[in-house]
From Swiss-Prot:
<feature type="compositionally biased region" description="Basic and acidic residues">
    <location>
        <begin position="17"/>
        <end position="48"/>
    </location>
</feature>
<keyword id="KW-0132">Cell division</keyword>
<keyword id="KW-0131">Cell cycle</keyword>
<dbReference type="GO" id="GO:0043093">
    <property type="term" value="P:FtsZ-dependent cytokinesis"/>
</dbReference>
<dbReference type="GO" id="GO:0000917">
    <property type="term" value="P:division septum assembly"/>
</dbReference>
<comment type="subunit">
    <text>Homodimer. Interacts with FtsZ.</text>
</comment>
<keyword id="KW-0717">Septation</keyword>
<keyword id="KW-0963">Cytoplasm</keyword>
<comment type="function">
    <text>Cell division protein that is part of the divisome complex and is recruited early to the Z-ring. Probably stimulates Z-ring formation, perhaps through the cross-linking of FtsZ protofilaments. Its function overlaps with FtsA.</text>
</comment>
<dbReference type="Pfam" id="PF04472">
    <property type="entry name" value="SepF"/>
</dbReference>
<feature type="region of interest" description="Disordered">
    <location>
        <begin position="16"/>
        <end position="78"/>
    </location>
</feature>
<dbReference type="InterPro" id="IPR023052">
    <property type="entry name" value="Cell_div_SepF"/>
</dbReference>
<dbReference type="InterPro" id="IPR007561">
    <property type="entry name" value="Cell_div_SepF/SepF-rel"/>
</dbReference>
<dbReference type="GO" id="GO:0005737">
    <property type="term" value="C:cytoplasm"/>
</dbReference>
<comment type="similarity">
    <text>Belongs to the SepF family.</text>
</comment>
<dbReference type="InterPro" id="IPR038594">
    <property type="entry name" value="SepF-like_sf"/>
</dbReference>
<protein>
    <recommendedName>
        <fullName>Cell division protein SepF</fullName>
    </recommendedName>
</protein>
Amino acid sequence: MAGALRKTMIYLGLADGDEHYEPQPEGKQTRPAQKNEEYVDQEIRHTEPASAHQASEDEYRAPVTPIKRAASNRDDSSGLRQITTVHPRSYNDAKVIGESFRDGIPVIMNVTDMGEGDAKRLVDFSAGLVFGLHGSIERVTNKVFLLSPVFVEVIGDDKKASENQASFFNQS
């Protein structure tokens, strides 16, 4: 039983595969007899713990490469320099939209050339992208959307005025 448990632990990476490991026989396991004698002052030694796995000279160690992340927040002083306009033909063009938006570039997405199903999938993808990166998405026309990063403020018609006007005409 202990052998199977040990093999499982080695397989899962919870224990090192030690070639010199000798399992105890599963028969009687004896414990050392406990002594009732008082402990005598013994010399206390402080030793450094041995590492669980000592590297051998033949073992290969790969160099560590740092991960470079794209800047998620831009300085306010840098200003807005470009906007990407995308006319996707299929859902495969979502990569271009995602990469531009991730880099902090506002994206105008025109899905008029797409079928209903793919256009809906792409809008759903864009909504998730905007939510994950704390941006905003706005409908410009029926099938044109503006994806704005968190540091870009879109100034346009006053939404409260248009909501009041809509509620005025909706007197049902």
